[in-house]
From Swiss-Prot:
Name of the coding gene: BOLA2
Gene3D superfamilies in the cross-refs: BolA-like
GO biological process: intracellular iron ion homeostasis; protein maturation; response to iron ion; response to oxidative stress
Gene Ontology cellular component terms for the protein in this record: cytoplasm; cytosol; nucleus; plasma membrane
Molecular function (Gene Ontology), one example: 2 iron, 2 sulfur cluster binding
Key words of the record: Cytoplasm, Disulfide bond, Glutathionylation, Nucleus
Family statement drawn from the similarity comment of this UniProt entry: Belongs to the bolA/yrbA family.
Functional summary from the UniProt entry: May act either alone or in interaction with glutaredoxin as a redox-regulated transcriptional regulator, or as a factor regulating Fe-S cluster biogenesis. The GRXS17-BOLA2 heterodimer binds a labile, oxygen sensitive iron-sulfur cluster.
Region of interest called Disordered, as start-end residue ranges on this chain: 72-93
Name by which UniProt lists this protein: Protein BOLA2
Quaternary structure annotation from Swiss-Prot or TrEMBL: Homodimer. Interacts in vitro with GRXS14, GRXS15, GRXS16 and GRXS17, but not with GRXC5. Interacts in vivo only with GRXS17.
Length: 93
């Protein structure tokens, strides 16, 4: 069984992300994951190439993972960190 921590460790060691989010969407059985990866290594690469890089970084884990959803594979310049202000409601009334 692949763990969230294993996926995080492999992506961190191979892609050196400045932002990484891994979510086990299989209910804890380690068969399905969603990932967001922001890495300088994606500079100059098209989206398909970036996805291939993520899959290559998880080569060993992919032998046991049933599904991998790559939600984001962005460069630091493309990535916009979640803003604390976005949760604030404005008063227009």
């Amino acid at each position: 069984m692949v763990t969230k921590e294993q996926v995080e460790a492999s992506l961190t060691s191979k892609l050196k992300p400045i932002h990484l989010e891994v979510i086990d969407i299989s209910g804890g059985c380690g068969s399905s994951f969603e990932v967001e990866v922001v890495s300088e290594q994606f500079e100059g690469k098209r989206l398909l190439e970036r996805h291939r890089m993520v899959n290559a970084a998880l080569e060993e884990e992919m032998k046991e993972i049933h599904a991998l959803s790559i939600k984001k594979a962005q460069t630091p310049q493309q990535w916009k960190p979640p803003s604390q202000d976005s949760a604030t409601l404005t008063k227009d009334a």
